[in-house]
């Protein structure tokens, strides 16, 4: 017969093991008499994009490039050893203009996040001739910044957030490109000292008729190219400089051209008036019959007849209008009857080489009198 201790010892061992294990509490809804709740299906998890800390959160500046042979070269930029007067700081995620060495004449700062130009922006580099600030976020320019750059010739500030044309522009400026901003104001007299300006680009802004006063362009004696396309003009701008060669007014809301408007431009060779609201009623008979005009764009308007042209015009775009018929005798700059006798006189032959008439109400064939007049035509689209 076994001793009671033989039975007691295994029981003590089991009790000690049970005390060492944690006690599990029953889950809610799993007690006796209750049905277990179904487990929710796991929802698929997709990586969520990191939200910026603030709406204007910008990418960090890029790390400095390789060491330069020029000790004054900003770490954020590149100084080409074979072009010591140039400084390339473009596409570096910069928030402000770095310290520019005095030796720099050509400065490239496009494709950054610069928001303003304080007075000290170019204080060391007064010999700058070329500045490219395209595609930044510039809203504010200190008036004293540019007046301290007497040798500046080219200023590019396209694709920024300017609301008016900068003041105190250097008098030696030759090209001013301010397209794709928010410009709706032109300060009085801002161009008055820019006698050397050749190109003024103000396309894709918010310029209306009220912005242009009779003296807005005063001082631009040598301006050759004026671009006012993609604005909200309803009228032709007044007192455009008479030295103009190229005039861009596409994509406005212009309905009429004053009688004799272009007569005061002896050098005007290129006109673009596509995508406006021009009609025959708003076009005086000889609006474009000016001596030096070579290229005329009038597509995407509401014109129903071909306007009179000069003998030297080479390219005429009249596509996408309301033209129903075309008469070569009426639009020919020369008398067709006299033309037969002097067919070999190329000096008097109209110079038109390209004529576009598609998108109207015309149908082939091309009228014979049209071909007899414009004998140098190389392409007619109808």
Curated annotation (Swiss-Prot):
Any one Gene Ontology BP term: skeletal system development
Keywords: Disulfide bond, Extracellular matrix, Glycoprotein, Heparan sulfate, Heparin-binding, Leucine-rich repeat, Proteoglycan, Repeat, Secreted, Signal
InterPro entries assigned to the protein according to its UniProt record, in alphabetical order: Leu-rich_rpt, Leu-rich_rpt_typical-subtyp, LRR_dom_sf, LRRNT, SLRP
Glycosylation site positions: 124, 289, 320, 327
Matches recorded under Pfam families: LRR_8
Source taxon at top rank: Eukaryota
Disulfide bonds: 332-373
Signal sequence residues: 1-20
Region (Disordered): 19-66
Gene3D superfamilies: Ribonuclease Inhibitor
Subcellular location: Secreted, Extracellular space, Extracellular matrix
Gene Ontology cellular component list: collagen-containing extracellular matrix; extracellular exosome; extracellular matrix; extracellular region; extracellular space; extracellular vesicle; Golgi lumen; lysosomal lumen
Biased segments, Pro residues type: 41-50, 57-66
Tissue specificity annotation: Connective tissue.
A molecular function GO annotation: extracellular matrix structural constituent conferring compression resistance
Modifications after synthesis and translation: Glycosylated; contains heparan sulfate.
Note on domains (UniProt): The basic N-terminal Arg/Pro-rich region binds heparin and heparan sulfate. Binds collagens type I and type II through its leucine-rich repeat domain.
Subunit record text: Binds the basement membrane heparan sulfate proteoglycan perlecan and triple helical collagens type I and type II.
Family named by the database record: Belongs to the small leucine-rich proteoglycan (SLRP) family. SLRP class II subfamily.
Function as written in the Swiss-Prot or TrEMBL entry: May anchor basement membranes to the underlying connective tissue.
Protein name: Prolargin
């Amino acid at each position: 017969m076994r001793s009671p201790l033989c039975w007691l010892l295994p029981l003590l061992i089991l009790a000690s093991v049970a005390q060492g294990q944690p006690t599990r509490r029953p889950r809610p809804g799993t007690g006796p008499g209750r049905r277990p709740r179904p487990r929710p299906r796991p929802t698929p998890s997709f990586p969520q994009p990191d939200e910026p800390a603030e709406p204007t959160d910008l990418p960090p500046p890029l790390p400095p490039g390789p060491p330069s042979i020029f000790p004054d070269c900003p770490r954020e930029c590149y100084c080409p050893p074979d072009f010591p007067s140039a400084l390339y700081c473009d596409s570096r995620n910069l928030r402000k203009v770095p310290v520019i060495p005095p030796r720099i004449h050509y400065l490239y700062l496009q494709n950054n996040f610069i928001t303003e130009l304080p007075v000290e922006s170019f204080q060391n580099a007064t010999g700058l001739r070329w500045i490219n600030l395209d595609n930044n976020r510039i809203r504010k320019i200190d008036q004293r910044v540019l007046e301290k750059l007497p040798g500046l010739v080219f200023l590019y500030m396209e694709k920024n957030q300017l609301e008016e044309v900068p003041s105190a522009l250097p008098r030696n400026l030759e090209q001013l490109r301010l397209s794709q901003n928010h410009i709706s104001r032109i300060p009085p007299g801002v161009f008055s000292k820019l006698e050397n300006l050749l190109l003024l680009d103000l396309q894709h802004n918010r310029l209306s008729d009220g912005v242009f006063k009779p003296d807005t362009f005063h001082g631009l004696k040598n301006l050759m190219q004026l671009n006012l396309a993609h604005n909200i003009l309803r009228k032709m701008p007044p007192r455009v400089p008479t030295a103009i060669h190229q005039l861009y007014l596409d994509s406005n809301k212009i309905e009429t051209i004053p009688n004799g408007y272009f007569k005061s431009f002896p050098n005007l060779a290129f006109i673009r008036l596509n995508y406006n609201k021009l009609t025959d009623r708003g076009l005086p008979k000889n609006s474009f019959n000016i001596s030096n005009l070579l290229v005329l764009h009038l597509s995407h308007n509401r014109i129903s007849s071909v306007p009179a042209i000069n003998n030297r015009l080479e390219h005429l775009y009249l596509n996408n209008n309301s033209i129903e018929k075309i008469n070569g005798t009426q639009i020919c700059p020369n008398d067709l009857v006299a033309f037969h006798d002097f067919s070999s006189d190329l000096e008097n032959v109209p110079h038109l080489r390209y004529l576009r008439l598609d998108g109207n109400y015309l149908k082939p064939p091309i009228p014979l009198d049209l071909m007899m007049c414009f004998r140098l035509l190389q392409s007619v689209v109808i």
